[in-house]
Amino acid sequence: MILTLTLNPSVDISYPLTALKLDDVNRVQEVSKTAGGKGLNVTRVLAQVGEPVLASGFIGGELGQFIAKKLDHADIKHAFYNIKGETRNCIAILHEGQQTEILEQGPEIDNQEAAGFIKHFEQLLEKVEAVAISGSLPKGLNQDYYAQIIERCQNKGVPVILDCSGATLQTVLENPYKPTVIKPNISELYQLLNQPLDESLESLKQAVSQPLFEGIEWIIVSLGAQGAFAKHNHTFYRVNIPTISVLNPVGSGDSTVAGITSAILNHENDHDLLKKANTLGMLNAQEAQTGYVNLNNYDDLFNQIEVLEV
């Protein structure tokens, strides 16, 4: 069983408009409302590829119950921790080929709720074999909250796949308890190291070999349409992917995390892990719906990906 954590989930609302009129009424004919958050995208893709998955995190109020019901309808198991605050909305206005987003901050977690979730998590940890942590921390939690979770996973021998950025990731990396996998992109690497980077092999090798990343088994760097670069222990890989028609890239990173987590759970070899992860990321990009993959195209894309030891 895989446990996914989305500590700051949202109800994602999409408003498609022919044109956005400012300071005027905009009428929307089709509204899409989904259970949102990076970790829930990971959850949906894991469920689609047939992995046993359990979703957890903080939810509160009517919007929190909406998320739970959406997962129920998709037959996805969940064990959320209920809080006093209201789960947030995240609104995307799609207009003239552009996307304008309005993101609520979300609820503030108090000390009692923060401690309560850790105890809740410790109980869930007893019955899972891998943990995928995605997205930002809600207001009120200390920057080392993910580090506290990772410490408990490491004490139980449970691998952790972590997808976050900024100060939260920096805090984790400076902690003695390390995740099994991190998945930064080039700009996130730059923020962490505060040094110039490019996509050359030497630059990437030097970056991921910095002392900051010591103790992390897998570092997988997304290069967008150029594929990926990875370091597994002391081995480096370059991943070349085919050119595809991209319909909606949002959620592709989360689908990649789902592939990594699935491969870690099933003890797949390095090449298959990298190919599975990138295949699911590309499949998501070919769909309008975020966190959805059409597995009919899986084998074709998987076989076109090239993984080279460099």
From Swiss-Prot:
Reactions catalysed, as given in the entry: D-tagatofuranose 6-phosphate + ATP = D-tagatofuranose 1,6-bisphosphate + ADP + H(+)
CDD domains in the record: FruK_PfkB_like (cd01164)
GO CC annotation, single: cytosol
InterPro entries tied to this protein: Carboh/pur_kinase_PfkB_CS, LacC, PfkB_dom, Ribokinase-like, Tagatose/fructose_Pkinase
Pathway: Carbohydrate metabolism; D-tagatose 6-phosphate degradation; D-glyceraldehyde 3-phosphate and glycerone phosphate from D-tagatose 6-phosphate: step 1/2
The entry's keywords: ATP-binding, Kinase, Lactose metabolism, Nucleotide-binding, Transferase
GO MF term set: ATP binding; phosphofructokinase activity; tagatose-6-phosphate kinase activity
Domain of life of the native organism: Bacteria
Disulfide bridge map: none
Enzyme Commission designation: 2.7.1.144
Signal peptide: none
GO terms classed as biological process: D-tagatose 6-phosphate catabolic process; lactose catabolic process via tagatose-6-phosphate
Family statement: Belongs to the carbohydrate kinase PfkB family. LacC subfamily.
Protein name, UniProt field: Tagatose-6-phosphate kinase
Species, as recorded: Staphylococcus aureus (strain NCTC 8325 / PS 47)
